[in-house]
């Protein structure tokens, strides 16, 4: 049985979309993220400037954003989405210089961040209709309500690892997609 079966049952019984249900539970706006294997006919990669994925999630509250490797300016997100292979050392050096942690520690942190096994053709952010992952920025009270929903639906406590390294792209969205569990 998948970890999310109990939660999916709760969502089905609510008779509304997962996005709407989670918005009602947490009081926050949720954004869908869809990993596309092929670019659809309605693909509109019109983002003028390259953007960080975490910024796109925030901006998607105003409308859908379609992303490709060349429209994401963050190498961490490109790595998490499987678009950047064999470039960990670039990220390690950047992290070490930016934070002051040793290269060895930076390497450990970078290598722990999940990566999509099969790179996607594009990432659609903002549309909840066919979302692979739902994401939001929550306040503490909303986070507590969400965790309580998880515990009630699954009968288990939520165990999470939290990291500031590629926090939204890799350690939240890709990790949730791979594990089929809540990531923070």
Short names for language-model regions:
Residues 2-184:
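Acidic, serine/proline-rich low-complexity intrinsically disordered regions
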């Amino acid at each position: 049985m998948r970890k999310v079966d109990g939660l999916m049952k709760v969502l089905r019984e609510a008779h509304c979309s997962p996005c709407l249900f989670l918005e009602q539970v947490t009081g926050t706006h949720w954004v869908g993220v869809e990993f596309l294997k092929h670019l659809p006919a309605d693909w509109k990669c019109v983002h003028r400037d390259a953007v960080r994925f975490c910024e796109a999630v925030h901006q998607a509250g105003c409308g859908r954003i379609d992303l490709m490797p060349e429209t994401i300016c963050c190498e961490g997100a490109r790595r998490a989405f499987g678009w950047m292979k064999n470039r960990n050392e670039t990220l390690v050096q950047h992290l070490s210089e930016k934070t002051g942690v040793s290269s060895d520690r930076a390497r450990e942190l970078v290598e722990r961040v999940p990566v999509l096994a099969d790179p996607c053709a594009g990432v659609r952010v903002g549309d909840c209709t066919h979302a692979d992952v739902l994401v939001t920025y929550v306040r503490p009270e909303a986070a507590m309500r969400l965790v309580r929903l998880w515990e009630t639906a699954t009968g288990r406590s939520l165990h999470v690892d939290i990291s500031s390294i590629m926090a939204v792209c890799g350690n939240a969205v890709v990790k949730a997609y791979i594990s089929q569990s809540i990531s923070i």
